[in-house]
Swiss-Prot record:
Top-level EC class: transferase
Catalytic reaction equation(s): uridine(2552) in 23S rRNA + S-adenosyl-L-methionine = 2'-O-methyluridine(2552) in 23S rRNA + S-adenosyl-L-homocysteine + H(+)
GO cellular component: cytoplasm
Pfam families attached to this UniProt entry: FtsJ
Organism whose genome encodes this protein: Actinobacillus pleuropneumoniae serotype 5b (strain L20)
Key words of the record: Cytoplasm, Methyltransferase, rRNA processing, S-adenosyl-L-methionine, Transferase
Domain of life where this protein originates: Bacteria
Molecular functions per Gene Ontology: rRNA (uridine-2'-O-)-methyltransferase activity
Active site (record annotation): K163 (proton acceptor)
NCBIfam families listed in its UniProt record: PRK11188.1 (NF008390), rrmJ (TIGR00438)
Gene of this entry: rlmE
Lineage: Bacteria, Pseudomonadati, Pseudomonadota, Gammaproteobacteria, Pasteurellales
Record-given protein name: Ribosomal RNA large subunit methyltransferase E
Enzyme Commission number(s) from the entry: 2.1.1.166
Length: 208
């Protein structure tokens, strides 16, 4: 006898396919609904300009990179990384690997090269177990690594956008970002599901 989906997973699938942003992404042949989250952030915060260099962490399936390419143009460059594979996007240099591993970080830094990065963006998230006591520390570890990446490659006055799940450690993390950047906003894009604990911290004016 085949296994049945749980009530919660069936409910998630029903919500997913009813979601207007999922439908829009499908109609427009976009990689994911995350495209619209970054678009909304760009309309408000103006992170991207033509010719910029961008690092995209947790890039797969490619919604953020796909959007950023439209903003930075052919003279810009995106260096993207994810533990999962991602179909190629013109203008995106993709590295598959676990960003938590030193060897992957070094390979990513090698691809960045001597260029200073204008925007670091992170949509990284762990595989969730459903246990907040486990999931939140895992998620916070990833966003701390993303902030460390800023310290290594971000140009003065550069920008950082990161998905963060509200919970233990969030306030301390926000305080750290405010110490490093001139302007820091917490955004909840319309394309983010209401019941999700995710928010996006948008930080501009890196103090270097």
């Amino acid at each position: 006898m085949g296994r049945k989906r749980s009530a919660s997973s069936s409910r998630w699938l029903a919500e997913h396919f009813k979601d207007q942003f999922v439908q829009k992404a499908h109609k427009q042949k976009l990689r994911s609904r995350a495209y619209f989250k970054l678009d909304e952030i760009q309309q408000t915060d103006r992170l991207f300009k033509p010719g910029m260099t961008v690092v995209d962490l947790g890039a797969a399936p490619g919604g953020w990179s796909q959007y950023a390419v439209t903003q930075i143009g052919s003279k810009g460059r995106i260096i993207a990384c994810d533990i999962l594979d991602m179909n190629p996007i013109v203008g995106v240099d993709f590295l598959q690997g676990d960003f938590r591993e030193e060897s992957v970080l070094n390979a990513l830094l090698e691809r960045v090269g001597d260029d200073m990065v204008d925007v670091v963006m992170s949509d990284m998230a762990p595989n969730f177990s459903g246990m907040p006591s486990v999931d939140i520390p895992r998620a916070m570890y990833l966003v701390e690594l993303a902030l460390d990446m800023c310290r290594q490659v971000l140009a003065p006055k550069g920008s950082f956008v990161v998905k963060v799940f509200q919970g233990e450690g969030f306030d301390d993390y926000l305080r750290d970002i405010r110490a490093m950047f001139t302007t820091v906003k917490v955004r909840k894009p319309e394309a983010s599901r209401d019941r999700s604990r995710e928010v996006y911290i948008v930080a501009t004016g890196y103090k270097g």
